Structures are given as structure tokens and as C-alpha cells.
Amino acid sequence: MTEQELQQLVEDISLKSFGMKFRHKARFNPRLRTTGGRYLLHSHDIELNPKHLELFGLDELIGIIKHELCHYHLHLQKKGYHHRDADFKLLLKEVDAPRYCAKIPHAQNSVKTRHLYVCTGCGTRFERKREVDTSRYVCGKCNGRLKKIKG
């Protein structure tokens, strides 16, 4: 899909789903790693991750476009455009847009757990990136002692 085809697709979705024109730029940004797209507040442009189109197809991309257009139209109407706002959640439901996009497999910033602790009282497992001082910290569920298993 070319940039012109993407621009036309975003304009069509905006008219059909929202009944309003999209008057700014839509483009692919291959630098996006962990997100499907983003709405830029200062320029009102929308950037989309081309990997989502490659890996998940056009339907996933259309969902991401609808999600970003929710941010776009609410921001221009001076309504709540954040994920936490009621206006945003309501508009997502109205246009059948997803709240989250599919995760890209093998994303570069996946969390690697190096240390594994187990509570001696209740058996709860705690995976941590950083080491924990077991003499200072206890289990949050039962106040039991922590025992280091891995790391």
C-alpha cells in the first residue's frame, strides 16, 4: 500500500464512520515498534505502523485507523481524546474501533525476566528484571519470606 492509498483509505473511513472529513496527513512510520499507530497532537497527523499491515492484514489496519481517528476528531472538537476519557470510550464503541491493537511477535522491547522469587508461605511466584533484597521485602499477599529460585 502506498502513502497515497493510505491517505485515501483514512479519508474514506473518516467520512463513512465519523461523518467528518480528515484534513491532515496520514503516513506509515516504520520506526514505530510497539504501537499500531499514533495521533500527533501538534500537527494533527496520523502515523501508522506498516508492520501491522504486513503481519495482520487490512482489517487490523482499518481498526487502528478508526482508533486514531477517534483521537483526531475528539481532539479537534475539544472533547476528551485520552484513552481514559468517557468521550473516547463512547466513540470507540460507536464506530466499532478496537481499544488495543494486536501485539507484534518478537517486539524488541520485550521484558526479559532474570530473577525468579517464590513466597515460602503461599507459593506465589514473582518474576523480576532487577534483583530484590529478600531480607527487606516480603510477599504482598501473605507477608511470607521470599526465596530466590533463579538469577
Swiss-Prot record:
Q: How is the cofactor bound?
A: Binds 1 zinc ion.
Q: Which InterPro entries match?
A: SprT-like_domain (IPR006640), SprT_Zn_ribbon (IPR035240), Uncharacterised_SprT-like (IPR023524)
Say which domain of life the source belongs to.
Bacteria
Spell out the GO cellular component terms annotated for this protein, sorted alphabetically and separated by semicolons.
cytoplasm
Q: Where would you find this protein in the cell?
A: Cytoplasm
The residues that the entry says bind Zn(2+) are 67, 71
Q: Which regions form coiled coils?
A: none
Recorded hits in SMART domains, A to Z, give:
SprT
Q: Which residues form the SprT-like domain?
A: 6-150
Q: Which cofactor does it need?
A: Zn(2+)
Please provide the record's keywords in A-Z order.
Cytoplasm, Metal-binding, Zinc
Annotated active site: 68
Q: Name one GO biological process term.
A: response to stress
Q: Which family does it belong to?
A: Belongs to the SprT family.
How is this protein named in the record? Protein SprT-like
What lineage is this protein's organism placed in?
Bacteria, Bacillati, Bacillota, Bacilli, Bacillales
